């Protein structure tokens, strides 16, 4: 909307200068707040949505974004990163400051589910997948609602789907769960319903491989 603000952090540190781009409805684009607020042409930035609903952009450090380095090391929010969307992009600023050369931070697991009438009656609203070896969601935990924030909290081996406002109906449904890239085993599907939760193995002996920017589809789960 007109007047919406995009904030840009140069190096990801909380104390870094913050530049601002303001959305201009007439031109349908974000424009620098002033001449001193322009992104550097050719520089890579990382897009993340902050808690306050504005957008921050973090520069890439030697080929990897600050956020990606944090995911590898398990660092917390020392750089002022209150939340990281699982599905996000790295882009290079061009002359107009628009988005180019994107790639995804995570992959997505597609889980076909045949939900029984009995279970649907329990008002199922969201799902998660759990990995016995703890590699499924990296060192961060995701919230079960869009845009799938990665919170900087304790290590987690669980990743969540979107939480629906109305329960799933019985029958064949498809659940999409964003997951950090990697390989995991003993993958368990948790089903969350009104007042409790249940679960079933997707495939106890199967290795689940999640690739950046790709959808991994597993076999149907009957629940």
Language-model features: where?
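Short, low-hydrophobicity acidic/polar segments
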Residues: 1-121, 169, 204, 211-223
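Beta-strand secondary-structure signal
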Residues: 46, 108-112, 126-128, 176, ...
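Short, hydrophobic beta-strand segments
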Residues: 34-37, 174-182
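Short helix-loop boundary/capping segments
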Residues: 88, 92-95, 109-170
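Ser/Thr/Pro-rich, low-complexity mucin-like regions
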Residues: 113-124, 179-211
């Amino acid at each position: 909307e007109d007047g919406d603000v995009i904030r840009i952090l140069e190096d990801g540190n909380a104390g870094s200068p913050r530049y601002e781009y303001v959305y201009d409805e007439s031109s349908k684009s974000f424009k620098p707040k002033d001449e001193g607020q322009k992104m550097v042409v050719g520089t890579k930035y990382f897009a993340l949505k902050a808690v306050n609903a504005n957008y921050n952009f973090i520069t890439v450090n030697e080929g990897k974004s600050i956020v990606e380095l944090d995911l590898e090391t398990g660092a917390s929010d020392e750089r002022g990163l209150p939340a990281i969307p699982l599905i996000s992009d790295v882009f290079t600023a061009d002359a107009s400051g628009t988005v180019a050369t994107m790639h995804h931070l995570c992959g997505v697991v597609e889980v076909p589910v045949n939900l029984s009438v009995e279970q649907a009656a329990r008002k199922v609203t969201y799902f998660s997948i759990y990995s016995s070896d703890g590699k499924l969601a990296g060192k961060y935990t995701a919230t079960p609602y869009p845009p799938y924030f990665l919170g900087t909290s304790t290590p987690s081996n669980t990743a969540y789907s979107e939480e629906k406002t109305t329960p799933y109906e019985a029958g064949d449904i498809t659940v999409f769960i964003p997951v950090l890239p990697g390989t995991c085993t003993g993958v368990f599907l948790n089903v969350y319903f009104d007042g409790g939760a249940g679960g079933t193995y997707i495939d106890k002996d199967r290795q689940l491989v999640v690739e950046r920017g790709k959808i991994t589809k597993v076999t149907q789960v009957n629940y």
